[in-house]
Every structure is written in structure tokens, then in C-alpha cells.
Amino acid sequence: SNQLREELSTYLKGKKINTNKDNIQIISGAQQGIDIVCKGLINYSDVVFVEEPTYNGALEVFKSRGAKIITIPMLDDGLDIGILKLKLEKIKPKLIYVMPNFQNPTGISYSTYKKKKLIELSEEYDFYILEDDFISDFSFDSEDNRPLKSYDMKNRVIYIKSFSKILMPGLRIGIVDIPKELQKKILWAKYSSDISTPGLIQKSMYYYMKYFDWLEYLKSIDKVYTKKYKLTKTLLEEKLGDKLKISKSQGGLNFFLELPRGYSSQAFYNFILEKGVSITPGTYFFDNIMDDRFFRINIANETIENIEKGITIIENNLDKFITSYKNGEDIRSNKIFY
């Protein structure tokens, strides 16, 4: 609805995003956003660059469109710009898909330098950036939680913002802010997917933003998430820091951990599930499984008490896992650059 788009454009301006209601399309959650952008822009054998590791829901969509996926490794302050430039010299992507704030699964945030650099490169090499933003409303430990889109003066960023993590997961609603020249294609794809996001959901969201103190609400959620995040980070460092490598998260609801070389996260998943803890094996977040020793823990729906319990169970059982699952030699193929 027009009213909701008006409210949302005000909200985005508050995040320093230069937009208006005509650039905003309302979508049924971020997954649909990725889907319609791909339908509108990606043809068979087009190249899409992604972070490694990345969100597997996006990988699946790119693959279903027949895209060729090229991965760029993540460093502690965002993706590896050196490797990105090497690949850009040789191959032209249609899109690069990124989560610049509190990346899923690593929790890493891009430095301001990298945010600006990525936009610079998109102009220089003429590709679009698909930004997936699910939780930049909060700052956690990050010095710059501004969306990449807020640095985008040249209309290179297609910006997807979902509200599931900050309102409620069952309410599949989000927005995609689309550069003018791409609007027709992407709007057509949205129309052919579901015509429009249910009116009732749009109206509820509009009333909520207009008549409730939306920013106050965000502040209260921020407190809850930040408390959980900081507690988990401290617990992981204290209890597991000397045994496992923990990715340098700056915030969010995910932590990405690394077992010693030669151990499998799939095996660890089975082992620790029997003890009552559920983790996500890292295999979900890679396009090519070179090495299955990473796993993710997600704290979105857990109470603080359960988080403490879960981490203690991992701490108490890790040595047992390591001795009983020694799994032969470590075969690691070298990365091949295209």
C-alpha cells in the first residue's frame, strides 16, 4: 500500500538511505526478495559472486536460476577485497550478494572502508550489489552498522530489508529498494510470484509503524538481543575459546565456530544432538565443501538460561568428541581461482 511505502521510506531515510516510496516494493520476507531479484535479473549461466561462507537460502535460489556461483572468502572486516579484485579482472558478475552487517553465519561486519570500496568497485566494473539486511537496526559491537545502501550514491545497490527478526518471524514482510533502471524487471517478477504481499499484513505493519512508537520498540528489542549476544560471546570465549576457533563476530544472532582440522561438523552435529544441543553444520553455508569443520550456533529463539546450558554441554563433551571421532587424515584441496 502507498501509505505503508510512505512510512517505510521515512524509516529508511532515518537509516541515511536516500530513497522515496516509488523505489520501494513490499515483499513477503527476505527470501522472496532474493527470489524476485534473481527472477528479474539472472539468466542461465550468469555469474553471481557470494561471500564464503554465506546464507544457503540464497545459494539455492541462485542455483535454481542456473547461475554460476563464485565465492569470495570472508576476512574479519568483510570480504577479501584483494581476491574480489582478482576475480573481477577476469570475470564479470551480474550481481554480488552480501550481508555487510552481522553476516550470516559469521556475525562479521564490514568496515566502513570496505563498504565504500565495494560500491566503488561496483561502479568501476559495472555490476549490481544485492544487500541482504536483517538486523542492522542494532549496533551490538559494531562501529558502523549503517546499511551499505546508505553509502550508495550511484544506484548500484539493490537493498533487501526484512522485518522478521525485529518484528516477528511469522510476519513475512520486508522491502526491496530497487534502482530505477531495474524496477520494471523486478516488479514483473514480484507480480508473477504472488501479485502482492497480503493486504492484511501490510495494513498491520502500517498501523504499527504509524500509531505505535516503532523506534522505542526497536530500542527494547535491541536491549534483549544485545544482552543475549554479549553473554553468548563471553561464554564462548571463556568456555570454548582455547579449544575452538570462534569467528570474529561483531553482532547479530549467529556465531560461527571451527573444529580442529580433520573433524567433521556433520559428525559433531549428530554427536551433540544426542546430548540435547542443536547446531547447524557448516556444510550448509558453502557452495563447495572443501572442508567440513565449521558449525553455527544461533541464539535467536533461545533463553539466556538455555544458551548457558547449551554452551556448557558443548564444553563438557568436546574432548570426548575429539577423541572418539579422530577421522583419519585431513584432505584439503587447494582453492582454485578462476
Give the predicted meaning of each segment.
Residues S1-Y125, S136-F138, E143-Y151, E305, ...:
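Conserved core of the PLP fold type I
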Residues N2, K223-K233, K245-E258, F268:
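Conserved glycine-rich beta-strand-loop-beta hairpin in the small C-terminal domain of fold type I
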Residues V50, T71, I129-E131, M205, ...:
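Hydrophobic residues in well-ordered beta-strands that form the structural core
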Residues M153-K223, T323:
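Conserved core segment of the aminotransferase class I/II
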Residues P179-K180, K210, E258-P260, A300-E302:
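Residue-level recognition of strand-loop junctions within catalytic nucleotide-signaling folds
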Residues Y263-F268, E305-K309:
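Short, conserved charged micro-motifs
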Residues E274, D287-Y338:
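PLP-dependent enzyme catalytic core of the Aspartate aminotransferase-like
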